[in-house]
Amino acid sequence: ILLSSLATGSIGDAFAELNQFEDAYDYYVKASKSDNNYTTPLFLYKAGTVAMRLSKFKKAEEYFTSIKLDYPKSPEAKNIDAFISKAIASNQ
């Protein structure tokens, strides 16, 4: 499952490099569904940042909040409050 989510997330990375953000978003969301402490917060973070770029601010807030609540010890949680605040502010 770990390798599968990494492969799926890597496809998302490739789409992001090509500025195909809708496709990247879809792959990051798929990759984030793998329930493990390593890849899930990473791909929730990537899904959130791409969601912000696509003006999906409520979804971004959900992804960032999930990192805060479910993966508080992950590297992605370190400054997540700033991302949550930015998503909330952008949605208003």
Please give the residue ranges for each predicted region.
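Short solvent-exposed coil/turn linkers within tandem alpha-helical repeat scaffolds
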Residues: 1-4, 31-40, 68-80
